[in-house]
Amino acid sequence: MKVILLERVEGTGVLGDEVTVKDGFARNYLLPRGKALRATKANLATFEAQRAEIEARNVKNRESAAKNGEALDGTQYILIRQAGESGQLYGSVAGRDVADAIKAEGGKVDRSMVVLDKPIKTLGVHEVKVKLHAEVTITVTLNIARSQDEAERQARGENVINSQFEEDRAAEAEAAQDMAEGGAGSFEGDHYEA
């Protein structure tokens, strides 16, 4: 299907381009979202008559997104989630969770703007791209932790999962040493009378 793009569409073209796309892409994505018009003679004439207005609106939207992006770019958000000992989350962090975290801090982001290749399923610090406009993309940092204290440790660059394993190993070694010396928890010297 031939369409006229009303804004830049990644991998397809820029404002004003007359391109041929698959019917499903046009019917399910471009046309319902107002990103394109069918390339008919009437629509071509209408587009050319309104081209300056459409371009001005696009520039205004881009500038607004760039201004919003300057405030959000590089910001860090903490998400507290439950996770197992290995750092695997019970569930995952999706685009909606990222958008909600940004909105909670006063940002103007919709979940469709969040670009995640796949949901985040582990604890740690993750970089996430947010596409505010077809030409404005920013990066925010998500600090996913089990507690506020753990989030602060991760923010300092500490690998919380590895340090937890080291603490567990040290505790086990201390318990084994204590048992070997006949300290608390050993059975040496315990007398049971029947």
UniProtKB/Swiss-Prot annotation:
Single GO MF annotation: rRNA binding
Superkingdom field: Bacteria
UniProt keyword annotations, A-Z: Ribonucleoprotein, Ribosomal protein, RNA-binding, rRNA-binding
Entry annotated with the keyword Ribonucleoprotein: yes
Keyword Transmembrane: no
Record Gene3D superfamilies: Ribosomal protein L9, C-terminal domain, Ribosomal protein L9, N-terminal domain
Region (Disordered): 148-194
Gene Ontology CC: one annotated term: ribonucleoprotein complex
Pfam families linked to this entry: Ribosomal_L9_C (PF03948), Ribosomal_L9_N (PF01281)
Signal peptide boundaries: none
GO terms (BP aspect): translation
InterPro entries: Ribosomal_bL9, Ribosomal_bL9/RNase_H1_N, Ribosomal_bL9_bac/chp, Ribosomal_bL9_C, Ribosomal_bL9_C_sf, Ribosomal_bL9_N, Ribosomal_bL9_N_sf
Function (record text): Binds to the 23S rRNA.
Record-stated family: Belongs to the bacterial ribosomal protein bL9 family.
Protein name: Large ribosomal subunit protein bL9
Gene name tied to this protein: rplI
